[in-house]
Every structure is written in structure tokens, then in C-alpha cells.
Amino acid sequence: MAAAGARLSPGPGSGLRGRPRLCFHPGPPPLLPLLLLFLLLLPPPPLLAGATAAASREPDSPCRLKTVTVSTLPALRESDIGWSGARAGAGAGTGAGAAAAAASPGSPGSAGTAAESRLLLFVRNELPGRIAVQDDLDNTELPFFTLEMSGTAADISLVHWRQQWLENGTLYFHVSMSSSGQLAQATAPTLQEPSEIVEEQMHILHISVMGGLIALLLLLLVFTVALYAQRRWQKRRRIPQKSASTEATHEIHYIPSVLLGPQARESFRSSRLQTHNSVIGVPIRETPILDDYDCEEDEEPPRRANHVSREDEFGSQVTHTLDSLGHPGEEKVDFEKKAAAEATQETVESLMQKFKESFRANTPIEIGQLQPPLRSTSAGKRKRRSKSRGGISFGRAKGTSGSEADDETQLTFYTEQYRSRRRSKGLLKSPVNKTALTLIAVSSCILAMVCGSQMSCPLTVKVTLHVPEHFIADGSSFVVSEGSYLDISDWLNPAKLSLYYQINATSPWVRDLCGQRTTDACEQLCDPETGECSCHEGYAPDPVHRHLCVRSDWGQSEGPWPYTTLERGYDLVTGEQAPEKILRSTFSLGQGLWLPVSKSFVVPPVELSINPLASCKTDVLVTEDPADVREEAMLSTYFETINDLLSSFGPVRDCSRNNGGCTRNFKCVSDRQVDSSGCVCPEELKPMKDGSGCYDHSKGIDCSDGFNGGCEQLCLQQTLPLPYDATSSTIFMFCGCVEEYKLAPDGKSCLMLSDVCEGPKCLKPDSKFNDTLFGEMLHGYNNRTQHVNQGQVFQMTFRENNFIKDFPQLADGLLVIPLPVEEQCRGVLSEPLPDLQLLTGDIRYDEAMGYPMVQQWRVRSNLYRVKLSTITLAAGFTNVLKILTKESSREELLSFIQHYGSHYIAEALYGSELTCIIHFPSKKVQQQLWLQYQKETTELGSKKELKSMPFITYLSGLLTAQMLSDDQLISGVEIRCEEKGRCPSTCHLCRRPGKEQLSPTPVLLEINRVVPLYTLIQDNGTKEAFKSALMSSYWCSGKGDVIDDWCRCDLSAFDANGLPNCSPLLQPVLRLSPTVEPSSTVVSLEWVDVQPAIGTKVSDYILQHKKVDEYTDTDLYTGEFLSFADDLLSGLGTSCVAAGRSHGEVPEVSIYSVIFKCLEPDGLYKFTLYAVDTRGRHSELSTVTLRTACPLVDDNKAEEIADKIYNLYNGYTSGKEQQMAYNTLMEVSASMLFRVQHHYNSHYEKFGDFVWRSEDELGPRKAHLILRRLERVSSHCSSLLRSAYIQSRVETVPYLFCRSEEVRPAGMVWYSILKDTKITCEEKMVSMARNTYGESKGR
């Protein structure tokens, strides 16, 4: 096999390119040694330092970096495969592409596709260093390997690579050490403690020597600076000109591929590979890496010739390239580059053309005849890289040696030997003499040599494979050494492969299960033993892509994206954001999107503009070139929906003839749609399981479900026209029977005609659901709607003798237990409670009477406890369960739930019940009637019927007989009763004349235990799908999926504002606090938290309150808005408003409350409440309109003032007395004035009423000023102020004052969950002053 050519990469990472010389010339500029001294004092990088010191060290000691590029052309040619996409001009700019183009004419299948060129690879690197794959080549370019070797020259010279085409169609590439290196590795001693001690001592010695040298150089530097400060520059001096060029170093390039004639190739193969043994039985080509050379002058050609012949002993084709070290600002070098670039293309094309002609004619070519330009640049077209080639010149090699040189054409590229220099004409006198400069230079060289000897140069080989996309086939293998890895960061389209690692060349291979996951690499964690992926805490595997991780714990970060943070300005001095917004976002709510598997629904802003209010304060101007806008509009196409994008590809079917190829009752649709082949079902129909037609799943069965539609014998199909669309039809499927059989009443099973009995003597067929005793136990139950479904879950059989007293035979599987006698016929009267339904909306509250009250009276009898002992699934339910699979859609499962329910009843209470609700108009009326009932039943003890009479019977008697009391208390009482079942005649508490029944049929009263229907499903996958659909129907309205404790809505479940609404935000019900009745200045409100356990998350409640008077425009006056979370719980509210939170009867239910303590008496107030969720939605409003209690009145003081006014008015009233009476009446409040008038008229009306006397004594003007204040008293308060007695009292009511423990950051949008807010509550006593109104004292 011909040895593949190689080249040294001239990239910037190479340590050979641009290596500075350390060969000094007489009279150097004085600043160069000083600069070199500072560079040497700094710790240099290992590779750069090693290359810098290469001139003054031994050839085998410095660190080297070499890059070799190996073409795969010879191996691919031997495989006799066609390289797809190669054409004559494909490789005009790349050597690999040209070679592929030259090889393609003689290869079969050159017009194949890229997929046909996939190859199996087996890459093995026994040396430390990673393997990288980059699919950065075009399909017309030839794949190649790049070896980047770092280490000493002795180690690099032992590196070998082998490339071979295996018989099984695999391209094998192996990088290893030579036999001596392998032997050294295999026989290395296991215990190296003495050598390590010696190395440590030598290391300490070297550090000491280096420290002394550094101190010496520092002293020389200080001495030089002192001399420089004492000297002065000569008066006549010139500024030196910059050097036009410098001495350049040598670097070696390997040709990517050299095309040889057949005789030379055969002679080379026979002479080179006879002494080598193949590992697998096929000749393996083997190319050693050349050593580097030392620093040498260009004026010594014989030394160069000797070096070249030393390299040629390995039988390789080499090239010496001269690359100058240019300085910034050299105009001549730039000019040379520009001039050389013009002649580059012609020379490269002519060279490649002669290569192709030589290959076709099988004759060698004399490359030395070509006259290339001084420099050339070749840029290979790559997807992600573009490398410039160094300038070269071509000629015949001189002084070659070796047996191979006589048998084949030897191609050697080398650079020119001389470069012109431009000397400086200016002379600058240096203050440092030559002796000091020489000392500094020698010390620098010694220091560099010592530093270089201390550097560790381990041997590493990085193998990079450059291939076209989809070149590597699945099943390829890679082997790396322990500690190395496979780099696929630049592999855009990786293949499935096997990855192994080994400790050394003789150790067994260990499979790296995690590293070989190229197509589905684990995002976070990977188990090295199994290769399975896992996630960090707070993350969970993606449901679809198990190797990816999604957030499972979002903490406080859920909610809309905080775009408002971006809208505000930022002060660099203070480091804070300004409260005013500089920018304004324009949102398009229809383009909202979910963050991937998260709780956040994001509405991105479609435009960002300057806020009009801030435009006057800022100097920001946003402009855009109209030409750019037009060009962008011309070059881009916008599609509103995905269907618009699909429709741009044209029709999917031709529906003009033969229904577009759609079968049966499918309709042909020419428009392209997502997941549609063009054949769709008519509306309200769905395809059959086998896809042969469309049917109505709510009315028929599916004969193609795999279970014969649940039919016992025949499943028949019939095509019927749709009633709402005459052009469409549906396939109706039903069960049938063969001859001598008849369809059973269940519609699916068949009965023999001989066994069918008809007539009055035959057994009655299965009765209907409503006529079956305890039939609810055999049917499904919807736990959300609290209703029993018609779908029968369990089979109703009467094979066992299941009897109970006073009832016919019961169905099998039912266990009926009668309750004890002491629990039968018991009347229960609840405690009187405020009527919550009357504490919301427009409230008519009378502080003299109190809250409206309600009581409940309940009597239960004929009670039975019913349980399911054994269950047998019904045939229809079993057939439906067989149809359901884990792939069943949510719509199918929801249809099942709608028909059969979500649970079945396992235990329930049956019997009869009488429930009566007693509504009292006020708390005062309820208390008086209760006292009256107790008094009469106690005093009339001789009448047994009254003594044992229930309270409900006593009230009913009062309402029936119209035995009204003096104060008409019973007039506002209302009794509403509801009866379930029939009351037995044995219960005197509920029986009614004419409606007694000895053994009434018990009805369902209470469900004690339910079991989900998915427990009846055996398959775990189907069970999980059913559970998911059940959760969706319960919490997400069947339009979304439940994830943790929230709903991810479908794309169709969005409201008009573009926000998800599958989990509706319920309306909170604002009401007066039942435990704290309003006073003249204090009102307490409360509401139940509407946040469900799963679904919508409430972020805040907004409470608005305003005073509504006759003279107030309610539309213009909006009142005051308070945020429950930000204003009340955070403590920002005033002392007049406080927040609280308590729990209801169930601990999971939270009740929020707000107390207002500074309201005006006798004022009409309107309170409004709405909820805000974490996505910015607002619930519907809930309002409470209430007039506060009348102002407090001191009745004793009012009576004293009335007596004082009478005394002033009595007899002759002087001017002083008139003024005193006027001042006294004007100082009191309007309510006190009204009460003074009441007392004056009650006591002294016979001497003239208050109005007439005031006008007579004070005059019309002053009397009008006083009496006009009485108009401010409302009609409600005026009626109460006319009461005979008014007593003042102070009540002390406990109240929970709560405050948030969390401090919210200022200037940030806060979207937290209110229920999760940590608050601390403290119980305090609230004093409330009230007036008690009555006709007599003490009542």
C-alpha cells in the first residue's frame, strides 16, 4: 500500500510555525535583550517555551507540537466504492476535494447519494489524548484524519499510525507506539519509589539554580537601568527604521495525498512492507513521524541537505516551507501578500490539472518544471473552518538517500533559502556597553535552557476525524486510553457507536456506556454501570426524551416573564433600577406560549418602543432604515399558522375525481394540515380502529376494535346518511345473531329461541335502573358532579339467596345491614347560624335586630348500611375496558368517564330523610322565639303533647294557626322542607297524615366510600392513561394535562386575551364576617380562598372600597384599591385597615378577612373583590353594599341638653341666653340633635314643639341653620333615634391580625402564590361601641 502523504498544519496552534530564532547578530538594538529578559522572567506556556528554547537545547529534550493530516483516499480506493457527489471541478479550492474528484471517474456508483457513502469506522488510539469527530466537510470533499502530537521529539518519533480497509467493510485506523515504546510500557517497574526520590531531589536542585539565576538577572537589570539613567542620548540621533523582514524558521508540511504511477506504487509497496507483519492479514501502511531540526542559519545548505536525507530515510514525502515572522506595520510584507494572492489560483489549478492527467496516464510528473509564485494562499471551503496555507515553492529534492529513492518518484517541496533584508540607516547610541549585553544574552539563554529542561512533556496524541455529514455509519467503534474521551461537540449529526477505553495497549477494553451516548447524551447525570440517564434534585426526566431533564420544582419563579424589569432604566452609579419605565412593551396575547414542561405561560412582547412619558426625559431615538425594512419584508415570508405554511406546498390530494382516493365515507380535503393525509372524517365522527371508515362512537360500537365490538356472535355494519349533512354518511355498527338465536336485551349477547320464554308466567327480564333496589351500587358515580351515572359497571345477577326482611330478593354481591333502633327516627336541630347567603351582595342590615339567622332540622329513619361484598363486571363494561389502551386519546377516555363515571360506590347509607330549613329575619327574632318556646313547654307541663313537641313543630303550629305575638315576631319566619323517600309510619317526627307507609323503599342518602374505576383496569399503562384523563376532567376541564399541582392547557383552551383557561379562575364570594357584626365605624369582610388543590394559582386579591352617597358620581369616583398581598399582609396599610387569615371547617380551606376600623357612621359603602392568578388573569367581581350603623348617641346627655334648652326657652329669653342655646345646639352632632328634639318633644311638647320654639326664640335665620342639620340623618337612623330607650355598650371581639414574614424586593414584579406566603398571625381584641335600641329598658 502506498504510504499516504501527510502535512503539518500551519494553524496558529502549532508550536513549529513562527518559532523565533535565538542566533544573535553583532550590534543588536539595546531594547531587544531587555524585552527578552522580561519575557523569560515570566512563566511561559509549556509548548511555547519549549519551541522558543529549541535552538539552545538538545534535539530530544524540548516539548514539540506536530500536526499531521492523513488522507483516507488510498483506503477508499482499495475498497472499490464510489465517492458520491464528486465532480471535475469540486476540488478547485481543496486538495482533498481534488483528489476525490480525480478518483471518482474510475469508480462505480459515482452518482450515488450521500447515504450510500456511509462507512463503518474503527478508530483506536492507544496513546493519551482524545478523539474528536467533526462533520465539517461538504459531500464532495474527502475525509481525512488530523493527528496533533505533543511531547518530546524522541516520543513523537515513536508514534505510528496504521490505516486499513477490513474485509467486513470497516475502515480501520490505529494510532500506537513503536515496538520499543510498547516494550518500555509493558516492562515498566511497578514500584518506582527510588526513581521518584531522585527526581524530587533533582527538581529541588533545579529550582535552586533557577532562583539564583533569576536573582542574578534582576541585579543585572537594576545595574542596566542605573547606567541608562546616567547616560544621555547623543545630540545628533536618528530614529531607526523598522526592519522589513526577519529570519524565518523551518517547518515541515506533509502533502495530503501524492498520486504515484503503478510501477512506483508497486515497488514502494514491495520495498516498504515486506518486513512488516499485518495484524489482521492484510497489508497495513505505516508512516512514522519525522523529527524536528534545530536552529540553523540559512547560509548553510549542506546542513539542510543532510537533514533532508535523514528525514527521507523513513520513506516519506516532506516539504520545507518558509514562513516569515512579520511585524505589525510592515508595508512591504503586506504588499507581497497582496501581489502573491493574484497569481495563486492559476498555479494551484495548473498543478491540480497535471496531477489528474498524471493519474489518468499512469505516468509520473516532474513537478520541478513548474514555476510557482513567491507565496500562495489556498482556502479550503469548510462549513465551520477556514485555514490559510503558507506560501511554498517547488523543486527537485537534492541529496536524497535510501532504497526507495531509486524505485519511485520522490516529491520534495521546500522553500526559498534566502530572504533580503532592509538594514536600518539610523544609528542610536546605546547606554549599555557590549560586555553587559553579552552577559545578559548568555544569562538569558542559560535561564531558558534551565526552564525548558524542567518542563514536563508527556506524550499526547489528539486524533480529529473530518468527515462530511452522515458519513459515519451506525455501529462504528472507538477505543481511547483511560483518562481520555470522545469529543463530539462539533459533530452535528452523530451516529450510534460503541466506545471503549483501555489502561494500556495490553489491557482489556472496558465499554463506556455513558460516553457512547452520542445521539442521546445525558443532559445531567449518567450511571456508568448501566448507561441510564438521571437528573439533579429539582429536575425530572422528560416524559418523551428520557435523556433530557426538565424542571420539576420551580419555587417562586413561576408566572409571566418579568419583562417589566427590562422596561425600567438602570443607574450605573447607584446600581438600582428607576421606578419609572423608559421602554414600553407591546404584547400580542395570541402568541403566548408555554415554557417547556413548566408552570409558566409566557406572553412575549412583539415590540419595544419608547414610553411616551419617558420620551421627554431621555435622549433616546430609535430609528430603522426603511430600505432595510422593505428588503427584510421581501426576503421573508410570514405564516400566521402552521396550516398556512403547509398550504404553501400545494394540495395534498386531487379531490376532483374518485373522492381523491379516500375510501368509504371519508371526505377528501385538498388542503394540507398537520397529521392529515387528506382523508378526514365528517364532523362529529371518528375513524374506526382499523381506519376503514368513520362512525359515531357515542351511538354505535366499533367492529374493528379487536373484540368484535363486544358482540357474542355477529357484528354488522350499515352505511346511513347523516341527518345534518346529506352529502356525508356514517357507518352504524350493531350486534346480531345467527339462525336459531335471538339478540338478548343487553344488545350484545345471544339467546337460543328454544330457551326464550314469553308471557305473563315467565320471569321478568332485567328491570330498569330506577326500579332496582340499591341499584346505585352497581352503577358508576361521578365524584365531581356528585351524580350516579347510567352506565352499569357491575353485573346484576340473582343466583344467590340474598334476602332481607320486608324486601324482595337482592342482587348478588350486596351486603345490607339495618341500623340499630336507637339511630332510627332521630331529630337533630342545629345551632342557629348567620345566613351566609344574605351576607353578600346588597345587604339590608339592621343593627337593632342583628344578622338574619338560619337553623336546620333533620329526621332520618328506615336506615340501612349497604356495602359491596363481591363484584362481577358487566359484559358491556368489560368490552369497553378491552377497547381502552394506553394509546387511547383523552377524548375517548373522557367519553368513557361521561358514560360510566369516575368511581363506583363501595359503601353508602340508604333510608328516608326529612330536612327543614328555618329562616329567621334576625338574631333577635330567633332568640325571642326560642325563649318563648322554652317558656311555654315548661309552664304547660301538664300538656304532654307540648312538652314533647319539637321546635320545628311549634313554629309550624304558630305559622298555621296565626297565633302571632304582640311584637309580630313570627311574621318574618319561613320554613322550607325537603323529603327523600317516604317516612315510615313508625316514626312520629316525620309522618304526615294520609301519607304513612309501613315499609317504604329506602333511597340513597349518603355516600360513605367510593373507589376509582381505574382500579378495575389490569394494564398499568392503560391505568395511568385513565388516571391522567380523570385528573384532567376533574381539575383541567378535560382540556389540559395535570403536571404536579397545575394544569398545562391545550392550545385550544385559551380565552380571548390569549391566556390559558382550562383551569378556570373561580369568583371569590365577598361577604360580611359572620362572627363580627358591623358597627358605626367598623366593618369586617371575609371570603373563602378560591385556589383549588390543582390548577389555578392565586397570586393576590384586589379589594376596592368607596363611599357611595347621593351626591357622589360612582362612575367617576373609583375609591381606593388595596392589594391583599402587597398592601395589607406586607404591613404597608394604615392602622385603619388590617388583614387576617383563618381556616374553615376543613383545614385545607383558607378564609381571608379584612377589617375596616375608620369608616363614617350611617354611610353607604361599596366593597368589591376580585382574584388575580399568577398569569395575570382577573376573576369576576364580587360586591358587598352596606350602610354602616347609626352614629353613637349618649341618650342621657341628649336628655340633659333637652332640659337645658327648655329652661333657656322658658320665660323671657335674653340675648345671652339665645346665644347660649344656639351655641349648644350647633356643637352637638346631627344624631344628638335629632335625639335632643325627640326628648324635648316627649317632655315639653305641650309648651310647643322643638321647631316652633326654636324659630320663636332664636329667630328664623338661626333656627333654620340648626334645623337644616336634621336633614343629614337618614330615614333608617331617624326611625331608630325615635326609640323609647337607647343604651350604649362596648363589645370586645377577638380578631386575628396577620402579617407576611417575607420581604418582597422593591422594583421587581412579584408573581408568588398567596397560599404559600409565610405569615404570622396574632390574636387581638377589637373594641366596638354599639347602640341598643328598645321600647323599654333592659329589653
From Swiss-Prot:
Signal peptide positions (record): 1-49
Cytoplasmic side: 228-434
Keyword Transmembrane helix found: yes
Subcellular localization(s) per the UniProt record: Membrane; Perikaryon; Cytoplasm, Cell cortex; Early endosome
Subunit-level organization: Interacts with ASTN1; the interaction is not calcium-dependent.
Disordered, as annotated region: 296-316, 363-408
Functional description taken from the UniProt entry: Mediates recycling of the neuronal cell adhesion molecule ASTN1 to the anterior pole of the cell membrane in migrating neurons. Promotes ASTN1 internalization and intracellular transport of endocytosed ASTN1. Selectively binds inositol-4,5-bisphosphate, inositol-3,4,5-trisphosphate and inositol-1,3,4,5-tetrakisphosphate, suggesting it is recruited to membranes that contain lipids with a phosphoinositide headgroup.
Keywords: Calcium, Cytoplasm, Cytoplasmic vesicle, Disulfide bond, EGF-like domain, Endosome, Glycoprotein, Membrane, Metal-binding, Protein transport, Repeat, Signal, Transmembrane, Transmembrane helix, Transport
Provenance organism: Homo sapiens (Human)
Substitution effect: V1293L: In a breast cancer sample; somatic mutation
GO molecular function, one term: calcium ion binding
Primary localization class, coarse: membrane
GO BP term, example: establishment of body hair planar orientation
Record domain Fibronectin type-III: where: 1065-1188
GO terms under cellular component: cell cortex; cell pole; clathrin-coated vesicle; early endosome; endosome; late endosome; membrane; perikaryon
Pfam family, one: ASTN_1_2_N
Residue intervals of the EGF-like domain: 510-550, 651-695, 699-751
Topology relative to the membrane: Multi-pass membrane protein
Record's protein name: Astrotactin-2
Family: Belongs to the astrotactin family.
Listed InterPro entries: Annexin-like, ASTN1_2_Fn3, ASTN_1_2_N, ASTN_2_hairpin, Astrotactin, FN3_sf, MACPF
Transmembrane domains' residue ranges: 207-227, 435-455
Organismal lineage: Eukaryota, Metazoa, Chordata, Craniata, Vertebrata
SMART domains on file: MACPF
Domain-level remarks: The C-terminal region after the fibronectin type-III domain presents structural similarity to annexin domains and binds calcium ions.
Lumenal side: 50-206, 456-1339
Disulfide bond positions: C514-C526, C522-C533, C535-C549, C655-C668, C662-C679, C681-C694, C703-C715, C711-C735, C737-C750, C825-C987, C916-C977, C983-C990, C1036-C1047, C1049-C1062, C1136-C1158, C1190-C1277, C1298-C1321
